Amino acid sequence: MLTGQEWPATPPPAVRPWLGPAALAGALGVAALTALTLSRQPPPYGFELGVGLAFLAVIGLTVVRIEAAAFIALALLGVIVVDPAPADFVFLVVIAVALVTGRFRASAPPGALVALGGFLAVSLLSAVEVVDHRVAAVYLGISIYLTIAALWLSGFVDSRRRARIVVAGYLTAAVTAAAVGVVAVLAPVPGKELFAASGRATALFQDPNVFGPFLVPTVLILLEDMLNPRLFRMRSLWKAALVGVLVLGVVFSYSRGAWLNLVVGVAVVLTVLALRRGGGRNVVRVAVLACLVTLLVVYVLAATGSTDFLFERARYQEYDSGRFAGQVVGIESAERYPLGIGPGQFESYASISAHSTYVRALAEQGLPGLILIAALLVSTVAAAVTNAVAGRETYGIGSAALLGALCGILVNSVVIDTLHWRHLWIVIALIWAGWARRRMLRRPPAPVAVAR
């Protein structure tokens, strides 16, 4: 077993020659769709000027320090009040510069790559005859963009330093969003309705059901890093404090899917840690921390009088029947349209959203699309399980945490559409980066020429 072992530096992932042109074509398509969307609703001149200057600044920063630009993109993930979000513009610039300068590398299990390419191809095929071509183009463009971003991130994370940059950026966005959301729920601050819609924490997200799950992967990463410090040098007390803030954010999102996501993720992390050497001690430490965080949550709920609303949210809601009815409509539409109704078209056929990644894939891309997206997720889970069982981290990012984060999202995906969640693709990319590292470590070292 290799748990806790310091891994030697590894060479960068091998470059697949077709990935660069494919990513460039996809990036150009996404840029064209963004321009089309903005042309239909042109912003004020001052806004255009500000965005233009920021765009030039990001280009310059990316050319000089791509790591700094990547950190900014990830730190902006908590600002999702508009689409495209600020983080998306920064990511597009970073990816474009990486393509132009030859720094675009990608690593993914072959099965995942084939399934991903097949899913996008099926999506394109199903988009030929759709009710709303503009919605289909935008939806497919977002899918392509997230795919390219995940592929780029999987190759970008090739050292412990870069892994720390990625997690630090994500953690900055998550902790800031959690703190803003919790304060907006509990304190009578001006403009609190902007950060806590209907009494539920949203921070700068549009939906509390996305805000809550966004925080979960960072909870799990910090949790494993407390037990096996490899990523951050901060004291365990500070990590525990950050976990407390993040968990409060999940709780005050009042999202049952986010709660389930967190419970599943923690359960997976505990199971993996229990199977490792010295697992009993780690499980006890996690259990103690969980009890302390639970006491903190109970105290805050009782002190703020939020207990009644919590129990009300935990019960079956009237709109739940509508959600399940929408899923039934999706399954029925798959019977009528074997190749699917086209990307983003579910709402054109039903009066409600799919509220399930799997039902949406079945309805919009047909049975082939569902099989391909399942193959993508299963191959990624398999890579995550292999790393977690062997104790191989992704350059310091705990493999148990990444497996738990992915499993939590997959369970959450039963009751909400997660395909366009940015943090889903971040988790997938980090798992792929860990898979590539294991593959590199298996390669025999290159022979060293001896001078005569």
Residue ranges, per PLM feature:
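N-terminal signal-anchor transmembrane segment
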Residues: 18-101, 125, 129, 409, ...
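Alpha-helical transmembrane segments of multi-pass inner-membrane proteins
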Residues: 28-31, 54-59, 120-125, 145-148, ...
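A membrane-periplasm/extracellular boundary helix in multi-pass inner-membrane enzymes
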Residues: 179, 183-188, 252, 270-318, ...
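Long extracytoplasmic/lumenal interhelical loops at the membrane interface
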Residues: 191, 311-368, 384-394
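Hydrophobic transmembrane alpha-helices and their immediate junctions
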Residues: 271, 367-409, 435-436
